[in-house]
């Protein structure tokens, strides 16, 4: 996309928080040029939390943001949709501490964006382009990013049977995201449920908003939406965490059994070293691609 965007009209949704189990309502509203994505806690006098890597607070089982002690949790699905569908500037009014899980995927949010419509501003979009490779590793897990003229993902996952090893590669565009990733739901294992509930997690989880596996397969009556739904959902999560860069990304991200903590570490590594990236406009990118084709 050449220009910055927002939504044309407000839209709203309601549900429960996956981990808190609390009822929550969100409204997505247009925001001015260069606002970015800003969460607005309507239950706390409109307190604002920008969706930025600077405000990452928790990265265990979900990504949470915090500013001055005020929390917004499980942000990754909604941010994934904004980032992939090309939504740069919105206010997200929310009346509790956790984004609603809805059906566990990004698809309901994609439908909300379609309902809202997209408005282009005249301000040129500025992209974050990776200039050199970097990686983060920990205990056999790894996430890397390489220079690329598109936003490209390679995602490798490995889980207990019956899921096993899965892999996925795609160029992230609104069209590819809507058809290849948005439908993939969050997931877990039946034998982990008691432990997670004892940790204060998944209080809002059900078969209506998550895939639950046993050693024999999913408990969900309708089964899986794709054989590799788990890998697709991890790619969806990854995009949501990369959205905290604050600008559309040009680079090839390779995630090998990575999770929220490693995603956050990569983002912090990028933003902590300006030599890793440059900020360019769509026109500058197009000019470079044209020159490369001619030369």
From Swiss-Prot:
It catalyses: a UDP-3-O-[(3R)-3-hydroxyacyl]-N-acetyl-alpha-D-glucosamine + H2O = a UDP-3-O-[(3R)-3-hydroxyacyl]-alpha-D-glucosamine + acetate. It is an enzyme of class 3 (hydrolase). Keywords: Hydrolase, Lipid A biosynthesis, Lipid biosynthesis, Lipid metabolism, Metal-binding, Zinc. The active site is at 260 (proton donor). GO terms for molecular function: metal ion binding; UDP-3-O-acyl-N-acetylglucosamine deacetylase activity. Zn(2+) binds at residues 77, 233, 237. Its EC number is 3.5.1.108. Pathway: Glycolipid biosynthesis; lipid IV(A) biosynthesis; lipid IV(A) from (3R)-3-hydroxytetradecanoyl-[acyl-carrier-protein] and UDP-N-acetyl-alpha-D-glucosamine: step 2/6. Its cofactor is Zn(2+). One of its GO terms (cellular component) is membrane. One of its GO terms (biological process) is lipid A biosynthetic process. Catalyzes the hydrolysis of UDP-3-O-myristoyl-N-acetylglucosamine to form UDP-3-O-myristoylglucosamine and acetate, the committed step in lipid A biosynthesis. Belongs to the LpxC family. This is UDP-3-O-acyl-N-acetylglucosamine deacetylase. It comes from Solibacter usitatus (strain Ellin6076). The lineage of its organism: Bacteria, Pseudomonadati, Acidobacteriota, Terriglobia, Bryobacterales. The gene is lpxC.
């Amino acid at each position: 996309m050449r220009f910055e965007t927002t939504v044309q009209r407000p839209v709203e949704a309601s549900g429960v928080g996956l981990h808190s189990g609390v009822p929550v309502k969100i409204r997505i509203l247009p925001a001015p040029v260069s606002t970015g994505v800003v969460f607005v806690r309507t239950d706390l006098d409109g307190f604002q939390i920008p969706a930025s890597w600077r405000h990452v607070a928790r990265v265990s089982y979900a990504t949470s943001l915090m500013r001055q002690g005020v929390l917004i949790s499980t942000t990754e699905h909604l941010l994934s949709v904004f980032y992939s569908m090309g939504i740069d500037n919105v206010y997200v009014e929310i009346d509790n501490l956790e984004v609603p899980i809805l059906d566990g995927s990004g698809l309901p949010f994609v439908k909300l964006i379609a309902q809202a419509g997209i408005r282009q501003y005249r301000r040129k979009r500025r992209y974050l382009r990776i200039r050199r490779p970097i990686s983060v590793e920990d205990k056999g897990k790894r996430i890397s990013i390489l220079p690329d003229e598109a936003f490209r993902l390679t995602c490798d996952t490995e889980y207990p049977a019956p899921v096993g090893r899965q892999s996925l590669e795609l160029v992230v565009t609104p069209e590819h995201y809507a058809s290849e990733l948005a439908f993939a739901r969050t997931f877990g294992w039946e034998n982990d449920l008691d432990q997670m509930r004892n940790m204060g997690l998944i209080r809002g989880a059900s078969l209506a908003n998550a895939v639950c596996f046993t050693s024999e397969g999913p408990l969900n009556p309708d089964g899986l939406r794709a054989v590799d739904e788990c890998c697709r959902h991890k790619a969806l999560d990854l995009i949501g965490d990369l959205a905290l860069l604050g600008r559309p990304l040009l680079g090839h991200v390779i995630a090998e059994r990575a999770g929220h903590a490693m995603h956050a570490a990569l983002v912090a590594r990028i933003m902590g070293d300006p030599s890793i990236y440059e900020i360019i406009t769509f026109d500058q990118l197009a000019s470079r691609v044209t020159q490369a084709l001619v030369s």
